[in-house]
Regions:
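A glycine-rich, hydrophobic loop/mini-helix early in the fold
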Residues: 52-96
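Residue microenvironments linked to proteolytic maturation
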Residues: 21-24, 29-31, 64, 82-147
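Short, flexible beta-strand-to-coil junctions
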Residues: 35-39, 68-70, 124-126
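Flexible, active-site-adjacent loop/turn segments at secondary-structure boundaries
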Residues: 35, 53, 73, 137-140
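Polar/acidic, low-complexity leader/linker segments enriched in S/T/G and N/D
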Residues: 1-59
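Short, surface-exposed beta-strand/loop "edge" segments at domain boundaries and coil↔beta transitions
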Residues: 37-43, 71-75, 102-105
Length: 147
């Protein structure tokens, strides 16, 4: 499947905060929550809640951390261990070990200065439910976690 085809039905969400974690030596590490469970997000024409367990089926997928969903600006990848994903009671957590590319260094510095304070993720939905009365969509299962 071509890269653009993967994103054809993808939805993107901006969530939570992104933080700098300086580890031993010169490593550049960013971490935060891509999604927070049971928290309503106002998407304009409806609100959305991501349910615990929504990501259970995609945790072993090859997921990339990208700058602005651009496949040319890869910050990390689960396949090679530079992106780690985990779930806890709060949500879907990520930890990215950045490489030495100039764009990664620039991105890291922008987060460190506070110019960039949020992150987003792209996904497709497998199962959802609606509360029509309150116009709230619950994301019960994610089909693909793209970035």
């Amino acid at each position: 499947m071509k890269e653009n085809e993967q994103y054809k039905d993808a939805e993107k969400r901006t969530m939570g905060t992104i933080e700098v974690r300086e580890a031993e030596g010169e490593e550049m590490i960013l971490e935060g929550y891509a999604a927070v469970f049971n928290s309503e997000t106002d998407l304009g024409h409806f609100r959305e809640v991501i349910k615990p367990g929504a990501f259970d089926d995609v945790m072993t997928n090859d997921v990339r951390a990208l700058i602005n969903h651009d496949p040319n600006l890869v910050l990390g990848r689960t396949k090679n261990g530079t992106l780690e994903l985990s779930q806890d009671e709060r949500g879907l957590k990520y930890r990215v070990k950045l490489g030495g590319q100039q764009y990664a260094k620039d991105f890291y510095e922008s987060v460190k200065r506070g110019d960039i304070s949020q992150s987003s993720f792209a996904f497709t939905i497998d199962k959802q439910s609606w509360n029509e009365e309150r116009t709230v969509r619950s994301v019960d299962k994610v089909r693909q976690l793209l970035d």
